[in-house]
Amino acid sequence: MTMKGGVASQDFSAAIATACEPAANVWSKVCVALKRELGDAAFGSWIAPAMLREAATGDVVLVTSTGIARDWIRRSAWRRIGELWAAHDATGRRIDLKSRLEFEAAAGAYVEATPKAVAAEPIEIVLPVSTDAPTVVAPSAKSPRTQGLQERFTFETFVPGPANEFAHAVARRIANWADGHFNPVLFHGPYGFGKTHLLNALAWEAMRNAPEKRVVYLTAERFLSTFVRAVMDRQTAAFKEELRAADLLIIDDVHFIAGKQSTQEELFHTLTALVGEGGRVVFSADRPPSAMTEMDAHLRSHLSAGLVCGLEPADRNLRLGILERKIQTLGAAHGFEPSIRPEVMQFLADRFTDSVRELEGALNTLSARAGEGLSRMTLDEVQAILRPHLRSGEKRITIDDIQKATAEHYGMKQADLLSERRNRAVARPRQAAMWLAKQLTTRSLPDIGRRFGGRDHTTVLHAVRRIEALRAEDSALSHDLETLTRKLRG
């Protein structure tokens, strides 16, 4: 009986251990299977960066850094994740999927909150070593001062160029705790121009240079949600104290609170208090303060009082530089040769001109599909993979549109582009228009030639090659092509 009792006791203990198995252990087992089934590229791009978080209630949430990653997982892997989780988790815990912003909004998380106020902590995931699955370590729990910051956004990974070199220099100066003559500082530019990268890099560098100083980084959306929660919980005094104790306060996307009166008032008082006490404040927005018509006039005035620094669209050389840096990062992360065919690189730089994020997203798509074969992908293969994305919401551009825009830009008549005139004042704009037609439409070379006064395809091919060669050395021509491309794409 004793032996039986001993066996029963051991079985019972094993059952209890299994039932109480930490979520991190369960997720590690799920990841081993997912990595084997999805492959290194897809797993590394979409699953590995996600973090498992466990709340005090026992609920488990897989948190992705972006909504795009969340959507990919939901579409491509979520059903399988659910099956694997159910198979390995004896307790039957429910696992949910959220983007970082969704999770933080739901939890009321705050970048500088004390440990007691944090609703959930990241769980470190270590995949067991096996013959078919190398060890993978997910990011460990961040200290409160670094929550909300993205480790990949540093000055080392930021590519400066004419479009952002002034903003880059200003951010570097702030991060070095140089004199705060301009305070506050506001960086502005449309979505995808590098503002968030710059602010993250600034925060990381400022903390590295002065570990004893208090740096607070948060998005305007988190500022709003945390303020609302503080009001509801009657904790506004603690909220104010946390912010106003900062040596450097960084708020991303401040335009988000435009029209939200009480939140604007709180930010206004925080700003004036910090500046008055010698603290430094940095904002980003999608437009300059003068264009924030829904913003409170007093707050808008204070945002304008320091240094307003715009980020311009990345030119072609900067886009190529960003692609090169991104390819090196992907190669280092996934263990393959960081290279890509020149014609593919040029295609990406020429087609994704509106946003650096769109440019990086296109490269991520190719990397996820090709993995180690990225360097071998042909231009036709790349165009086939990205074609659905290129069609999405893209304005249809006609050769007539191109001719009209080119003629207007160079101060000439559209008929001049179709004429037989060969003097440089006409020939160069005509060649530029042919190059644009090749880049922005799906028309064949013979068709383009017919629409330029009945010229043959060899004339068009010569024009395209001539412009391709010239724009690398002629900055004025390169600027003209950038301007026309943006105008045509709306």
From Swiss-Prot:
Q: What residues bind ATP, as annotated?
A: G192, G194, K195, T196
Instruction: Give a Pfam family name.
Output: Bac_DnaA_C
Record's GO cellular component terms:
cytoplasm; plasma membrane
Upregulation details from the record are: Expressed throughout the cell cycle in synchonized cells, with a 2-fold increase 10-20 minutes after time 0, just prior to replication initiation in nascent stalked cells (at protein level).
Q: Tell whether Transport is among the UniProt keywords.
A: no
Q: Explain what the UniProt record notes about the effect of disrupting the gene for this protein.
A: Probably essential, disruptions have not been isolated.
Q: Show the segment(s) annotated as Domain I, interacts with DnaA modulators.
A: 1-91
Q: What is its main location?
A: cytoplasm
Q: List the disulfide bonds.
A: none
Domain II: annotated span? 91-147
* GO molecular function list: ATP binding; ATP hydrolysis activity; DNA replication origin binding; lipid binding
In this chain, the stretch annotated as Domain IV, binds dsDNA covers 371-490
Fetch the HAMAP family from UniProt. Answer: DnaA_bact (MF_00377)
User: What binding partners and quaternary form does the record give?
Assistant: Oligomerizes as a right-handed, spiral filament on DNA at oriC.
* Family classification: Belongs to the DnaA family.
Briefly, what is this protein's role? Plays an essential role in the initiation and regulation of chromosomal replication. ATP-DnaA binds to the origin of replication (oriC) to initiate formation of the DNA replication initiation complex once per cell cycle. Binds the DnaA box (a 9 base pair repeat at the origin) and separates the double-stranded (ds)DNA. Forms a right-handed helical filament on oriC DNA; dsDNA binds to the exterior of the filament while single-stranded (ss)DNA is stabiized in the filament's interior.
Q: What is known of its domains?
A: Domain I is involved in oligomerization and binding regulators, domain II is flexibile and of varying length in different bacteria, domain III forms the AAA+ region, while domain IV binds dsDNA.
By what name is this protein known?
Chromosomal replication initiator protein DnaA
Q: Which organism is it from?
A: Caulobacter vibrioides (strain NA1000 / CB15N)
> What does UniProt list as this organism's lineage?
Bacteria, Pseudomonadati, Pseudomonadota, Alphaproteobacteria, Caulobacterales
